[in-house]
Each structure stands twice: as structure tokens, then as C-alpha cells.
């Protein structure tokens, strides 16, 4: 085989390793217990990953979410004792060009709020954050593969819980 073929093969193996590692990590995030992985912990990991990748990460919380009009995230989260966050990661490589944005749902636990789910249905509700985990790891793959586009990952992180301030139906 030629050196060019070997080089292509090696690139493919390296890409497969990167993709496999990122998929496994997204799966690991999804498998964490909901009482361990809240918006605070998820956003802290997001900041560390962005720093490793040389990407920009901005975390909006509490008053900043309210000030900027993110009422949907706040409404879903208002029954929770934990604070909602919005993590926005960016990697700009072509100044003045638009961004391709990936958005991943990050409801870290979804009890259904006042529209309470059955115990059986609630078992898998920690997986409502897998959209955010998958987008975060897709962002990592794109950055590490040095895509030539401006990319952004938007991760709304909330918990839909029952509480005296929880959003009511109707």
C-alpha cells in the first residue's frame, strides 16, 4: 500500500477514535444520576471542555436569563431548587461570517412538573438532557477536526420539578 493510502487510513482511524470517545462521553453524561448532574455541574464541565478546545464559553444564569428574556428556560425550571443555566460555546475561525448553531435540549430531570409522570415513565427522565450532551460532544468533534466553519453550541440546562413555584398547566 502507498503512503497516501496509509495516511488516509490513519486519519480515518483517528477520526473513528475521536468520534467513539465523544459518543461514549455523551453516553456517560446521560447515565449519571440526576441528583449528581445538575445545571451547575453540566455548565462547569462545559467551561472546562471549552478551555481545553480553545473555544469560548458563556454561561448565563438567574438574573441574566431573566434580563435577556429567556422565560421558557426559567418557566421550566421554576419548580426546582437548582438554578437554570444556558451554556453557549463558540468557535470562530472565519470572522464576519455567520455561525452554524447546534442546539441541544438539556432538561436534566423531567418529573413532568404538575403534569406528573408515572414512576415507570419517570425512570428514564434523566435522559432528557441527552440532546445537550450529544450537541456538546458534536461540538468537540467539529473543533478537534478543525472544521472551517464558525460553530456554536447552545445548551439550555434546566430541571422540570414540582414545587411551590412550578409552572402550572393552562
Residue locations for each model-derived region?
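A glycine- and small-aliphatic-rich helix-loop capping segment at beta-alpha/alpha-beta transitions
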Residues: 76-80, 117-126, 168-170
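Alpha-helical metal-binding/catalytic segments enriched in His/Glu/Asp
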Residues: 46, 100-102, 115-159
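A structural-propensity feature for long, helix-poor, extended segments
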Residues: 155-157, 162-170
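N-terminal hydrophobic/helix-forming segments and targeting peptides
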Residues: 1-108, 141-145, 149
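Short acidic/His/Gly/Ser-rich catalytic and metal-binding motifs that mark active-site loops
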Residues: 109-117, 162-165
Amino acid at each position: 500500500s502507498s503512503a497516501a493510502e496509509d495516511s488516509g487510513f490513519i486519519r480515518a482511524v483517528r477520526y473513528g477514535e475521536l468520534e467513539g470517545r465523544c459518543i461514549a462521553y455523551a453516553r456517560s453524561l446521560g447515565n449519571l444520576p440526576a441528583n449528581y448532574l445538575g445545571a451547575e455541574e453540566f455548565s462547569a464541565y462545559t467551561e472546562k471542555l471549552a478551555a481545553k478546545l480553545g473555544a469560548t464559553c458563556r454561561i448565563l444564569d438567574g438574573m441574566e436569563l431573566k434580563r435577556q428574556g429567556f422565560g421558557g428556560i426559567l418557566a421550566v425550571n421554576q419548580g426546582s431548587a437548582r438554578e437554570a443555566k444556558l451554556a453557549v460555546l463558540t468557535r470562530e475561525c472565519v470572522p464576519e461570517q455567520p455561525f452554524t448553531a447546534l442546539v441541544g435540549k438539556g432538561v436534566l430531570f423531567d418529573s413532568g412538573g404538575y403534569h406528573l409522570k408515572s414512576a415507570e415513565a419517570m425512570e428514564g427522565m434523566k435522559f432528557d438532557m441527552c440532546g445537550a450532551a450529544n450537541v456538546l460532544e458534536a461540538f468537540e468533534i467539529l473543533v478537534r477536526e478543525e472544521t472551517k466553519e464558525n460553530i456554536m453550541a447552545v445548551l439550555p440546562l434546566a430541571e422540570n420539578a414540582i414545587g411551590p413555584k412550578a409552572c402550572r398547566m393552562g
